[in-house]
């Protein structure tokens, strides 16, 4: 009952017909694939875990897996492996009874959500919370040159036929320098500005039928960039929204939680 009351209030706030919203709730089972941020992120990160559990308490089906960029796995294999893992998690949600699939990414989970939506356009919506991981920015912005050097090094290794050799490469997460060991080919799958791990690349390729909510916090390092870097590259969809909240990179999911639920009611409403 609490779930229906909450979502019906949200439907009313969004100007939707409450009776129609209730009918939709009875007909649909929403499955959420929640994708955490990059190392030190992971499924136990309280900033995303409490957010995901709220949706579970509302009666939705939730998967919050340990992805290849977590603190435990950082970074485990090629970007394609991450997409394959997401495929299995979506299949799990469907096997549990989900009839609608929503991808929710935080930080690096955002480019993963976009890339998956490009490959699997049968998802119903995507939520980008504090979008992070910017291969084009890593390559072009003067303060991120250590990553550019690693991208050039990895490209040279691939060109020399050494793409499957492991090496130490640079990464930067929220201003913190990181070192990651993986093959040059796998590194480029995450960091090449032309790869689909680059949000600007994937956003433009998302099906126009998929509504996307982009949420950015006022204290996020990408606050002034997120709209033009990601959201404005999405194809037009009348249900897509861009939302600014008073939060930093880590607290954005929790701060935006109720607004995300309200948007989902609108985005998933059947016409």
Give short role names for the model-derived ranges:
Residues 5-22:
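N-terminal export signals
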Residues 56-72:
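Conserved alpha/beta-hydrolase
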Residues 76-95:
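Alpha/beta-hydrolase active-site loop
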Residues 127-137:
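Active-site nucleophile loop of the alpha/beta-hydrolase fold
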Residues 221-227, 252:
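Conserved alpha/beta-hydrolase "acid-adjacent" motif
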Residues 247-271:
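Catalytic active-site module of serine/aspartate enzymes centered on a nucleophile-bearing elbow/loop
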């Amino acid at each position: 009952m609490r779930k229906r009351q909450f979502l019906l209030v949200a439907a009313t706030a969004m100007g939707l017909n409450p009776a129609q919203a209730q009918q939709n709730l009875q007909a649909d089972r929403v499955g959420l694939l929640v994708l955490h941020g990059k190392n030190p992120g992971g499924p136990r990160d309280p900033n995303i875990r409490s957010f995901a559990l709220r949706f579970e308490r509302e009666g939705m089906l939730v998967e919050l897996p340990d992805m290849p960029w977590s603190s435990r796995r950082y970074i485990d294999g090629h970007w394609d492996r991450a997409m394959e893992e997401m495929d299995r998690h979506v299949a799990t949600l469907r096997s549990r009874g989900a009839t609608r699939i929503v991808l929710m990414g935080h930080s690096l989970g955002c480019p993963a959500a976009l890339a998956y939506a490009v490959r699997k356009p049968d998802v119903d919506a995507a939520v980008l919370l504090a979008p992070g991981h910017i291969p084009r920015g890593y390559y072009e912005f003067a303060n991120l040159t250590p990553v550019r050097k690693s991208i050039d090094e990895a490209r040279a290794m691939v060109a020399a036929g050494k793409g499957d050799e492991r090496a130490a490469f640079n990464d930067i997460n929220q201003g913190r320098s990181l070192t990651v060991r993986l093959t040059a080919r796998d590194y480029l799958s995450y960091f090449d500005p032309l790869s689909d791990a680059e949000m600007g690349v994937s956003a433009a390729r998302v099906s126009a039928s998929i509504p996307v909510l982009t949420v950015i916090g006022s204290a996020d390092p990408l606050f002034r960039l997120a709209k033009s870097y990601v959201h404005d590259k999405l194809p037009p969809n009348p249900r897509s929204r861009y939302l600014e909240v008073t939060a930093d990179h880590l607290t954005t999911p929790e701060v935006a939680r109720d607004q995300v639920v309200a948007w989902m009611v609108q985005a998933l409403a059947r016409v």
